[in-house]
Amino acid sequence: MNTRKTFAFVALCCCALWANAQKLTSPDGNLVMDFSLNQKGAPVYELTFKNKPVIKPSTLGLELKREDPEKRIGFEWTERKDKERVDEKMNLMTGFKVRETHTSTFDETWRPVWGEESEIRNHYNELEVTLDQPENDRYIVIRFRLFNDGLGFRYEFPQQPNLNYFVIKEEHTQFAMTGDHTAFWIPGDYDTQEYDYTTSRLSEIREKMKTAVTENSSQFVFSPTGVQTALMMKTDDGLYINLHEAALVDYACMSLNLDDKNMVFESWLTPDAKGDKGYMQTPCNSPWRTVIVSDDARNILASRITLNLNEPCKIEDTSWIHPVKYVGVWWDMITNKGTWAYTDELPSVKLGVTDYSQTKPNGKHSANTANVKRYIDFAAKHGFNAVLVEGWNQGWEDWFGKSKDYVFDFVTPYPDFDVQEIHRY
């Protein structure tokens, strides 16, 4: 290839990349998000704050679960290409082309039901990108909203013949960090968030994971570099970055898994017992993925991105909603001074069949009438608004570690808990 042809080829490539590129700026101009498609047709975004890189070029997409036809009786692949074609249909990561883009600006002030502020401003610039996947004759939408304090984006799946019902195998949303930041993190765990926070460099997460995973009654740590959101970080040049999500409805919770060689986080969804990470029916969308950023740590706490991206309140009469202080009949059980269970002599419980009146009380059941009255007296004397009572209803003997569909009876009290007397008192 001669020099002239080489130059022409490079120029054409640059033009093609430029044609796919879109830029979105926050209302105050401090944040800039760039969107493009790479050579594989994968969606890519990057984010800067006051000309400082926050998120390096990061890819977006999902991997769908393939229903294996080989498991069907009498089915055989006729050609290798048939299997490859099915695998390709599971790809919502590459092979995209930009069909159209729309930009808009939104600015409103709304009143929360309650909170730290009486009014919240919802001000952002939006980029809506419609992406066609010609190979599979389907399309998706990625919607970006850029606020003065951060970025929110989500996947949207319009209803269409070739994308109706689908199962999520993995979500491959990346957050590529610009360095080995200081992070304030807890282990990624499907079952609990009850961990102390660890402060370390991103590169130290793997090393410190063993000591960070303290004993808990129920836990499932999914990766030696997995962490939970919200994840807080600080860069060496003074930026504060928070990764989280908003509007989590009918979708799996997102944790983050770190590639600690390249300092790239990728979304990690919580699976069900089969390992599936989402059962979707179009039209539908993912939760918002959020990146809050500032050079002032106070602005991270003051950010209202999560509230602004959540759906508006649909409750018409909110007059009954107000904050309260309460005491609870549960801490003495956690400290082993009492129990949730009424008796210790039952090998198992069958709801509606087990007759607790014929069993021997263990003498340590905390949610009994006399003890709850004592808590009510304490709350009334010291200005608390309510008393939370755990362990009053039947079934707590089998509450943990049993493969059981129906553990609790939510209407029938233990023999030592008189609902009517508590109500009267």
Regions found by a protein language model. Give the residues of each.
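Carboxylate/His-rich catalytic cores and anion/metal-binding grooves
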Residues: 297-316, 320-325, 369, 373-376, ...
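Catalytic cores of large soluble enzymes that bind and process phosphate-bearing ligands
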Residues: 121, 143, 282, 319, ...
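Substrate-binding cleft of carbohydrate-active enzyme catalytic domains
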Residues: 326, 338-425
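Solvent-exposed loop/turn segments at secondary-structure junctions
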Residues: 155, 296-298, 333-336, 393-396
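Tryptophan-centered motif/residue detector
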Residues: 184, 243, 328-330, 340
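N-terminal accessory beta-strand-rich subdomains and adjacent acidic, glycine-rich linkers
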Residues: 23-316
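Bacterial Sec-dependent N-terminal signal peptides
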Residues: 1-23
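Feature activates predominantly on carbohydrate-active enzymes
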Residues: 180, 283-286, 292, 309-337, ...
